[in-house]
Structures are given as structure tokens and as C-alpha cells.
Amino acid sequence: MSRVLLTTSLALLLATTTASASKAPAKIVVHEGDSLQAAIDAASPGATIVVEPGVYQGDGATRAITITKEGIRLVGAARRNQPVVLQQTGTQVHGIWVSPADSTDPDNPELPPCGMRNEQLHGFSVSGFTVQGFPGFGIYLTCVDDFTIRGNTASGNLTYSIFPVRSSHGNLSRNQVSGTKNDACLYVGQDESINVHDNVATDCIIGFEIENSHDVRMFGNRAINNTAGMLVDIVGNREVTSISGNVVAHNTFENNNRPNTASPDEDTSQIVPGIGLILEGADDTLIQRNRFIANGLAGMALVSPCVVDPAFCAPPIDFDPNPDQNRVVKNTFEINAADVFYLPGAGQGNCFAGNDPATLSVIGEPLPVCK
């Protein structure tokens, strides 16, 4: 290669490298006493915001912090005995709120405007935070595609501690969630293609919930000392009106006998303590290799909401309430009051096989065997 060509090639390489470096997402470091929201507002899409240990309260009146930019990585640099805490203050209802800009103040957080238009925010992650004391949601995502919520602690958030809704391709892992007094610790609602693994939920009305969602993989989680360990269900008045293709495997549902403390005006106030897993109206769910231990009413329930509460299915309804094609296989039931509560109503194609003990104690109808 001639010196001219070599010089030209090096110049082009240098120009390309410089251009790439100039486009690299920025890293912003936030220290205790700094404004988290100011750092978010200053960040470019794709930026990483590293938050040093300390107690932060956020600047928002309703939402402590709000993120409407794509690709933001929020990293709590927690160290041993030095957490990164987002603490509720004043009139704040929600902790970390992530959504497209048009959906920061929806009339109903479960019916976000972005969901009606199939608009999405692409890319978000949060890790290493302790989010506590919010009367609404601890961590809320709506219409977010490609997200990660990993290694956080959410406690004392009264409605939902971690709540992705109308979102897709997400990973929720290694979170510790507790003290949600009105509803679910971790709630996957109207979502698609979500992995939920190795989380712990305790002291909530519902430990984990999958509602009106598809292709959710719930594995390796522990639901302990909740009113109900987990709920897989379908409800009306949602943008997504079906639920199917979900897998609940290798989880532990233990001692879910907590008294129900939900406000009387909440639907969740009707949940009777003592069931590890409630599958209500869902279709095509695989319940496999879970452990159900010391639940005071039943290890699990597979029911039609129309049987449990006929008023729930009073016409008109915009969903199919019958639980169909659910498989319950190779699970272990230990010292529950009953193993299975089975009232499928008009549901068809449900079956049980390979569970331990081989003969399960049942409340309701005889269990159909998988062929």
C-alpha cells in the first residue's frame, strides 16, 4: 500500500472512530443531594445514569421521576449497607414512571393512550434501586418495548410495586418486593413476551399477577406469606381482551395465608386468604414443576370467574371467561389444606398429570387427566 493510500485510510478510520465516539450515549453520575429528574432531563436518549448511594425524593408533584426518552439506563450503584433509595415525599403518588410523553397523566393507568395507538418507547432498564412508600406504583412502565427491571427492592408501595402494562419483550429478575397492601407486588398486565424470574414477593395481597397477557414466562420465583401467592386471570374493560400462552414453572408458593388488608372498595378485597396460585379464566397456561407448600385453603385453584362470582360475568362482557386448555403437570403439593380447588365452569380441555402426590386432594369437580 502506498503512503498516500495508507494516509488516506488512516484518516478515514480516524474520522469514523471520532464520529462513532461522538455518538456514544453519555454517562451521567448523580450524587446524593443532586436532582434525579434534572439528570434525566439533561440525558440524551440511550444515556446511562449512575446514581450513587443515598436517599433521593424526586422533584415531581405526582411522580417522583418521569422518563419519556428511549434507551435510558438507570443504574443504582448500591453497595453493602449503602442503598440507593427513592423515597416518597409530599403529594407524590408514584415512584419511577416510564412512558411515551403523551401517557404521563392517563385517566386510567391500565388504559394508557399510547396503548390505544400502539405507540411504544423503545429501551429502558433500572437496577439497584430501593423504591419505597408510594401509595400508587413503585415502578410503572407503560408502552415500553425491550426493558429490564433487575435487582431492585420495592417495599411499602400500596397499589402495585412493579407494574409494566401494555409493554413487551421485558425481563424482570432478582427483585425483592414486599408490603403492597391493596394489590399485587409484581403485576404483568396486558403485556407480551415477558420473562419474570428469580424474584421474591412477600406480604402483599397478591404476590405475582399475570393479567390479560400473552407469552409470559414466570419461573424460579418465590411467593411467600401473601394473601394469594399468584393470580393468572382475565378481566374486562382492558385494551387487551384475552390471555393465553403463559408458563408458570419452577416457582415456590408457600404459606400464602396473610389476612386480606385491601380497602373494601378494591376488587382485591374479595380474595380469600390461603391459596398459592389462582388461575381464573385464563387459557393455554402451563403450570409445571412448582412447589405448593402450607397454603391454608388450597395449593392452587383453577376456576371460572362466572362460578366464583356470577355478577362478574353479567352481560355485556368483552372477554371469554372460560378457562380452557390449561395443563397442570409435575408439581409438588405439601401440607396444604387441599391440593386443588377445581371449578372450571364451562371451561374445556384442562388437565392434570404427574403431580405429587399422585392422588391430589380436591375441592370441587374431579380432575381430568392429561392424555
Model regions and ranges:
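Right-handed parallel beta-helix
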Residues: E52, G71-A77, E119-G133, D145-Y160, ...
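Bacterial N-terminal signal peptides
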Residues: T7-T16
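Bacterial N-terminal signal peptides that target proteins for export
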Residues: M1-L6
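Right-handed parallel beta-helix/beta-spiral solenoid domain characteristic of secreted/periplasmic
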Residues: A24-D34, P53-G60, A64-T66, E70-P135
